[in-house]
Design a protein with these regions (language model features):
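An acidic/histidine-cluster motif and surrounding catalytic segment
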Residues: 1-91, 95-276
Length: 276
């Protein structure tokens, strides 16, 4: 239940919307109002109109839609750094937002271990999860064994923004770069069940390219990255576990000292019952 939420300062929030998509803008403004989130609209960048400061990031290997989506997200990352924001919510204009989304975000950023980069608010995967902390009964902060696709709803920290703005030639769509966190050393978490979903009945241009991928090589990189971030015991428990979030193991707790919501450490909240 939300109580007196409007009396609290708003979390930094932005949503991406093409100037010509007036109906999407109206729908999104209504979503935001219902969830008591105040978000600044950022005009989406067209793939063939990338700003000068991002020109060196792209060549012809990505389609216009992929370039535009990536450039729009990187533009907000730049705003996060310029305004010295500790983190910001980034939404695309096809997001459907649950009423308790804001509260879930406020707790999640307190639970997240020091140095977190991204907290996902949308989930499209059935991969096993590792529980990091309890947001409320039935909802947890988690780490993914395999990061889901979609950038419809993300919370990006300042460190995450800086990593996403690492000078490079962008070879993958933004959702793939986040799904392959080892490329930019992104520390990615998520809220499960997710407080953001994709609105039905809205046509969305996919950002997943159709070209082939070096699957086996990525599997090895993902495994090494996950073991480094999670610890071997936690990785194995998650890998052989089921869909329910697996509590953190001792090797992870020994490395984590973050204080979570209501003064509980990550170790304490990580061992609470997940709605069972």
């Amino acid at each position: 239940m939300l109580q007196n939420q409007s009396s609290h300062p708003s979390i930094p929030a932005f949503y991406i919307n093409l100037n010509r998509d007036v109906s999407r803008r109206a729908r999104m403004e209504e979503e935001l109002a219902n969830s008591t989130i105040q978000a600044e609209r950022i005009p989406a960048i067209e793939g063939r109109a990338v700003p000068d400061w991002l020109q060196s990031f792209y060549d012809d290997r990505l389609g216009p839609g992929e370039v535009g989506c990536s450039a729009s997200h990187l533009t907000i990352c730049r705003i996060i750094i310029e305004r010295n924001l500790p983190f910001a919510l980034i939404l695309e204009d096809d997001a459907r937002i649950e009423k308790d989304c804001r509260r879930a975000i406020e707790i999640a950023v307190k639970l997240a271990p020091c140095g977190w980069d991204i907290i996902r608010l949308i989930e499209t995967s059935s991969r096993p999860l590792q529980q990091v902390g309890v947001i409320d009964p039935g909802r947890s902060l988690v780490r993914y064994l395999r990061v889901p696709r979609s950038t419809t709803g993300l919370v990006v920290s300042q460190s995450g923004a800086r990593k996403l703005l690492t000078p490079r030639l962008v070879k993958e769509p933004i959702d793939v770069e986040i799904r392959w966190p080892w490329q930019l050393d992104l520390d990615v978490y998520g809220i499960h069940p997710p407080p953001v979903t994709q609105a039905s009945g809205i046509e969305v241009e996919t950002t997943i390219p159709t070209r082939s991928r070096p699957k086996k090589r990525n599997q090895l990189r993902r495994m090494i990255f996950n073991i480094r971030k999670m610890g071997l015991a936690s990785y194995l428990a998650c890998f052989f576990g089921d869909r329910e979030p697996t509590p953190q193991s001792e090797d992870f707790y020994a490395r984590s000292h973050t204080i979570g919501a209501a003064g509980h450490s990550t170790r304490t909240v990580g061992r609470q019952n997940f709605g069972r």
